[in-house]
């Protein structure tokens, strides 16, 4: 058995605290949620709910970040199903475009096109290209196989190319 800082067989790091995870990941989670649902306020609500669910579990989560992303994705899917949420106007994404250093019209066009993708394709694109997740990590968040992730990304990129060329 390997020896760790805490002794033989013990984990070397304690579970992360709410405060540390919140400080490190809140902004990133809100951005992810906002791109999924197209509304900053709703994105903040989804992120808050994800943090609440993650840190109020009976059994603590060893690695909260994948759990938080999966929870936000599921909450977004549930919201679309339950409420029949209509797609918001592209103007709701414009504040995200101005958050970027490069900003500009090209980013706005791309974000608009991403927002108009079906939810699973949108989630796959955001996780891959904005969050830099691997196909395996995306599959875990979306609850599918890596092959499905490849298919989702392929279809999404084809759609995005066509939309951006318009």
Spell out what each predicted region is.
Residues 2-31, 41-44, 59:
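A short, charge-rich alpha-helical start-of-domain segment used by transcription regulators
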Residues 29, 33, 68, 72-80:
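Hydrophobic-face residues of short alpha-helical interaction/recognition segments
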Residues 45-52, 56, 62-74, 151:
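Structural recognition of an alpha-helix C-terminal capping motif at a helix-to-coil junction
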Residues 56, 63, 73-91, 103:
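Arg/Lys-rich amphipathic alpha helix in sigma70-family domain 2
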Residues 73, 77, 142-166:
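DNA-recognition helix of helix-turn-helix
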Residues 86-114, 134:
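Internal acidic/polar
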Residues 115, 119, 131-148:
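Helix-turn-helix DNA-binding module
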Residues 124-128:
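A short pre-motif secondary-structure segment
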